[in-house]
Amino acid sequence: MYKRQNETQPVPVTIEKIVGEVSRTFNVSPADIRGTKRNANVASARRVAIYILREVTGMSMEEIGREFSGRDHSTIVYSLKTMERDMKNDQHLRETVSDIIKNVKA
């Protein structure tokens, strides 16, 4: 099967793209998301970034932990469980995550 010349390949979704989009959405710096700050807004943005990385890229928990200041995989598991619980109860969070995923895949 041949491609038409004007068809474009989807841009690969990178960690930087996901963290950048989460950063813009939550008004937090990418360095803070990947860093060790623990204030509520940064922690929320970090959980969203971790969740999206796992869902979109399929990275292992160990790989994700290394990208976020060397966090242990158990910390990543906790973040994912927290996000799953929060998304069940929070329509706005589900919409925010969905919008970020659409933007990083665009």
Roles of regions detected by a PLM:
Residues 1-5:
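Conserved small/polar residues in nucleotide/adenosyl-binding loops
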Residues 31-106:
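Terminal-proximal interaction/regulatory segments of ATP-powered molecular machines
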